[in-house]
Amino acid sequence: MNYLDQLDQMLDANFRIVSMETYDPERVTDLFTQLSRFSNKAFYVWENGAGLHRIGASHIKIPRTVVPKELLEHVDSCKHFGVFVLRDFNKALADEKTVQMLLRIAAGEVSKVVVLLSDFIDLPSPLKPFTLRSKHQMRQAG
């Protein structure tokens, strides 16, 4: 099974939150880009300070999504399935309101997946039962 198949299976699992720890978040983001080309799912990427954009349309930022609170309000209000890749979201996870909003998204009626992507993720305890966790710790030999 290749990486794209594994990634697709993770997204199809019954978890609304996925945490992915990796030494190479850029490579994983590239895998999401590749996966989006062969999928009917809508994929979005959020980066701190840059906001949210749909993969394949990075030049079009989604308004009012730069701040984590506004981003999660946007994700919660989406009426369609989407995969939302949040890069380096640890600072926001320290805020109790952020955790509550993620729990609300995880329990929502509209199926969507929030992917927390970073080299290390300090996952708050209340989110652990709702989160599929993945750690990729191999470094490339050089």
Model-based region annotation:
Residues 1-142:
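ATP/nucleotide-binding catalytic cores
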